[in-house]
Amino acid sequence: MTFEELRAEAQGCLACNLSSRRTNVVFGEGNILSPLVLIGEGPGDTEDKTGRPFVGKAGQLLDKALAEAGIERSSVYITNTVKCRAADWSTGRPMNRAPTEEETLACRRWLVPQLGLIKPKVILCIGAPSAKNLIKKNFMITKERGQYFPSEFAKTAIATLHPAYILRQQNISGDGGFSLLVADIQKAWEAAQRLVEKDAMGKADKMVIEAEEQGTLF
């Protein structure tokens, strides 16, 4: 299955109850050849309306952090562990809520092949829920952000603070953790680039060895 075929199939997903109230499936966007994938928890109201990940206030702060790190948004791939908005409708007006474990598990049918097709070198988990889903269940974001962890979907994974959390903290103090977000993005990007270079060198060495074995190098 191609990436676009997977995206098209996801648009009709009925695997959990989030499908009944969604406006759009927010599959993800960006460079599918990127060595770095950013993964949040799930779309909010603005994302549900537009079908694009991280385009609300938190997304705008993420864009600012990417720019501060010297990285164009279009050069990475951005998605979420859950592709549909999770909302509480009990008051008649939808309010964002955390996806349930069942909803998150249901969406792995899209996330796992999505990452399998992209084949990123590094995954940057945006926020604690993403890290708990993709790194380890007892992940502690304030203590373990910015560190390298093994990943079943990439060479390594790093987690950082969620822009929504930073926005809340900025109401209390100026930086609110924004500088940490920028630093973690830079670290993840630089690690991804190093891994790309390492793979390229490995392939070049392999080609030299094969050429020598075949007597065609000189």
Task: Identify the residue ranges that each predicted region occupies.
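A polyanion-binding, active-site-adjacent surface
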Residues: 1-218
